[in-house]
């Protein structure tokens, strides 16, 4: 009984809180700040590996990065990030490493982000992402670190 109510409230929250900021593809040379969402609830994987990789590679490029890596305790009843963990305003790139469209925290963070360019690993309803880099293998088989490296290669090709 709780699940349908929660899903209804999630849809309402997405509709109410969704960002209306325009988004488009940006070359990496135009990116000055980024937010990387690492799925802290992914099973069988250490999210710290992807978080460290994202911090290191963006720092090497001179891009300010904030890594969001929420555990279950960092989410509210609906599955949204707690206010203290929220995505900052005014970022250029939002990158989600969540492999499943069922990860509501990633979908909500992406939808509400005011980033000028959004990229992710799976297609979400309403076309939230400007760029989707899906694994050629079965969904979710790549680690988040492997997915980050692959997405970064695509981002480097955008002129």
Q: What are these language model-derived features?
A:
Residues 1-34:
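Short N-terminal or domain-adjacent regulatory/targeting segments
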Residues 126-159:
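Active-site-proximal region of nucleotide-activated glycan assembly enzymes
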Residues 25-26, 35-63:
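Histidine-anchored nucleotide/phosphate-binding helix
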Residues 32-33, 64, 117:
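Residues at the starts of beta-strands that form the adenosine-phosphate
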Residues 64-73:
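A short beta-strand-loop structural module common to alpha/beta enzyme folds
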Residues 36-39, 68, 96-97:
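Conserved beta-strand segments of the P-loop GTPase G domain that flank and frequently precede/overlap
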């Amino acid at each position: 009984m709780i699940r349908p109510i929660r899903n209804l409230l999630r849809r309402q929250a997405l509709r109410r809180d969704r960002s209306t900021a325009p988004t488009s593809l940006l070359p990496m040379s135009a990116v000055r700040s980024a937010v990387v969402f690492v799925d802290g609830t992914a099973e069988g994987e250490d999210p710290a590996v992807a978080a460290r990789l994202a911090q290191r590679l963006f720092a090497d490029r001179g891009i300010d990065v904030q890594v969001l890596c929420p555990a279950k305790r960092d989410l509210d009843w609906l599955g949204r990030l707690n206010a203290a963990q929220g995505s900052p305003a005014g970022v250029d790139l939002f990158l989600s490493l969540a492999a499943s469209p069922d990860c509501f925290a990633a979908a909500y963070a992406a939808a509400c982000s005011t980033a000028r360019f959004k990229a992710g690993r799976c297609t979400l309803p309403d076309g939230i992402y400007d760029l989707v880099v899906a694994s050629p293998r079965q969904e979710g088989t790549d680690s988040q670190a492997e997915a980050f490296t692959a997405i970064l290669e695509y981002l480097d090709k955008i002129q």
